[in-house]
From Swiss-Prot:
The gene is eno. GO terms for molecular function: magnesium ion binding; phosphopyruvate hydratase activity. Pfam families: Enolase_C, Enolase_N. Keywords: Cytoplasm, Glycolysis, Lyase, Magnesium, Metal-binding, Secreted. Catalyzes the reversible conversion of 2-phosphoglycerate (2-PG) into phosphoenolpyruvate (PEP). It is essential for the degradation of carbohydrates via glycolysis. It comes from the Archaea. The active site is at residues 204, 334. SMART domains: Enolase_C, Enolase_N. PANTHER family: ENOLASE. It is an enzyme of class 4 (lyase). Belongs to the enolase family. This is Enolase. CDD domains: enolase.
């Protein structure tokens, strides 16, 4: 089936930021059958310096104009059943590595909508269109429980995310339920240390108390142990430090805690957190150019997930650079960081080349679309990072549960062993 019409409009993310939604009409020239698919671009609050440009110069209106003038005329007539044909055309039309002419938001929304159209045209689920007939492994959900940093307007802990993840759940429903229960249980512990807390949540639905990073970890550890004991599911906890947002060029500035740490002090601080709180997952512990510190931490904690987000920005070349020195055991994959599903797939391939685990991730300003769940299964990701609470978060989690039901006895779920 071929694209017969292409539209774009301004819509909003769950954070209230303006983004773009692309709508494609595809038609079978023989039968006359018509399908319509849509997709919107998510938006991040803390963006890596090497990500594609979200909007071209001139903002969202310039993005709309670029789509109507440059993109739509070129993609009409393309066969959506040919994987990545639209993505290739987007790169050809823009002609820059960072999608500076049309913007990454236009590129990823178009890429997603075309993939949805391809799957619908063939009558297969999107995860099968992306990953093939044997895509059947479900990822472990990694959820943001307590929030700080930029996602919480700088009012909570300096570390951006305090995370929970079931490590050995029997199925995807139990995995999601485990995180939900931890999120609920954490509130009880927060109120014990911050009696004035009124239940505020950040962009990703995480609690935002005014507590220190170490207090947040103590609370999360206790809640995770409690839920783990009740459900019989091993639970790991972790952090997304988002260290690039703390780095001033010389030191890591923890404003709320009144502490500045040089690179060596930052390394020892992170190592101490891993040891003291038995962290299984550590994302972006150092700034986005410090590949060597990542490699040193990974070498010291070989059995933990040391993960790069801003370090790699879903860029195959940066992933290869890190892979050659053993900078990480896991890679965050955010398709919008690189602009198309084709490029994101290339990033996954680069990660696999160096034995890294794949964590498909949402953005803090996400949308109600459930595409990410299918991408995670299609890419064979071990982990999906998509929050716990909030409509744009549960949309992905509920879709994973549906995929699990659809796959039935053929479904498997990742198991992670630590220690």
């Amino acid at each position: 089936m071929q694209i017969s019409d292409a539209w774009i409009r301004k819509v909003f993310t769950g954070r209230g930021d303006v983004t773009v939604e692309v709508e494609l009409t595809v038609e079978d020239s023989v039968t006359g059958d018509v399908l319509v698919t849509r997709a919107a671009a998510p938006a991040g609050a803390s963006r890596g310096a090497h990500e594609v440009l979200y909007f071209p110069e001139g903002g969202v209106d310039a993005a709309l104009a670029a789509f109507e003038k440059l993109v739509a005329p070129e993609i009409v007539g393309l066969d959506v059943t040919e994987p990545y044909s639209t993505d290739g055309k987007l790169e050809e039309v823009d002609g820059t590595q960072r999608f500076e002419k049309i913007g990454g938001a236009v590129a990823i929304a178009t890429s997603f909508a075309a993939a949805e159209a391809g799957a619908a045209s063939l009558g297969v689920p999107l995860y099968s269109f992306i990953g093939g007939a044997y895509a059947r492994r479900l990822p472990l959900p990694l959820g943001n429980v307590i929030g700080g940093g930029k996602h919480s307007r700088g009012l909570g802990p300096d570390i951006q995310e305090f995370l929970a993840m079931p490590l050995n759940p029997p199925d995807i429903y139990t995995a999601v339920y485990t995180n939900v229960e931890i999120h609920k249980r954490v509130l009880k512990y927060i109120l014990k240390v911050d009696t004035s807390f009124t239940g505020g949540k950040n962009d990703e639905g995480a609690w935002t108390p005014r507590i220190s990073s170490t207090t947040a970890l103590k609370i999360l550890r206790e809640a995770a142990r409690e839920v783990s004991g009740e459900l019989g599911v091993e639970v790991g906890i972790g952090v997304d430090v988002a260290a690039s947002s703390l780095w001033n060029g010389e030191k890591y500035v923890y404003k709320n805690e009144g502490v500045e740490r040089d690179p060596r002090e930052q390394f020892e601080f992170i190592a101490k957190l891993i040891e003291e709180y038995d962290l299984v997952y550590v994302e972006d512990p150092f700034h986005e150019e410090d590949f060597q510190s990542f490699a040193e931490l990974r070498d010291r904690f070989k059995d933990r997930l040391i993960v790069g987000d801003d370090l790699f920005v879903t860029n195959p070349e940066r992933i290869k650079k890190g892979g050659k020195i053993g900078a990480a055991t896991g890679v965050i994959i955010k398709p919008d960081q690189i602009g198309t599903l084709l490029r994101a797939h290339q990033a996954v391939s680069a990660a696999r080349e160096f034995g890294m685990r794949v964590i498909v991730s949402h953005r803090s300003g996400d949308t109600e679309y459930k595409t990410l769940a299918h991408i995670a299964v299609g890419f064979g990701a071990e982990v999906i990072k998509t929050g716990i609470m909030g409509g744009e978060r549960t949309a992905k989690l509920n879709e994973l549960i549906r995929i699990g039901d659809y796959l039935g006895k053929w479904a498997t779920i990742t198991q992670i062993r630590i220690h």
